[in-house]
Amino acid sequence: GDANVVYNKATNVMTMAGTLVANNMTTGSGAYAFRTAKVKTGVTTTTSAVEICATEASTVSAVDYTIVATDVSNQSRQTVKITSAIFATTVNYTEYATISVGSLLADFAVTYVPGDAFRNAQIVLYATPATTNTTNYKILVDEYSSS
């Protein structure tokens, strides 16, 4: 094995020296699954509302978002924190933190979108940008299990 990664079967503990890199990470497994952290991205070039992130509705009871929006041509960056609670088709959310360098780049909304022939029902994060400049979004999504 690798000396930087050690698994102790007796204590059921894995120890790692160094950096762990992952795009998805789940806390808990099986019946104990609780939270999955995912990294997602989006881009807008319009002032209309755009879906920048979606999560299958049947799998979550809550979703938290950390959004970093960047408009290089406007030399602006906005960071936003949103938390949401989901039950069946009802979604309540609050944007509880926003800070920016330069201009505010977008408003955000979290909505339940019913399923159709192409995809199951989704919890969707929409961005409504302030300009038509290209705005890039990096999103850390924390999905809390519905089971």
Task: Give the role of each language-model region.
Residues 102-147:
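Low-complexity intrinsically disordered segments
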Residues 51-87:
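Beta-rich globular "head" domains
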Residues 19, 66-68, 126, 142:
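Residue-level recognition of well-ordered beta-strand positions that form the cores
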Residues 35-37, 75-77, 91-94:
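Surface-exposed loop/edge segments in extracytoplasmic proteins
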Residues 83-105:
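Terminal beta-strand-rich extracellular "head" domains
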Residues 5, 78-86, 108-117:
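Broad, structure-driven detector of short, well-ordered beta-strand segments within folded domains
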Residues 1-49, 59-60:
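Intrinsic low-complexity, repeat-rich intrinsically disordered segments enriched
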Residues 4-11, 83-89, 143-145:
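A short, sequence-level motif marking secondary-structure junctions
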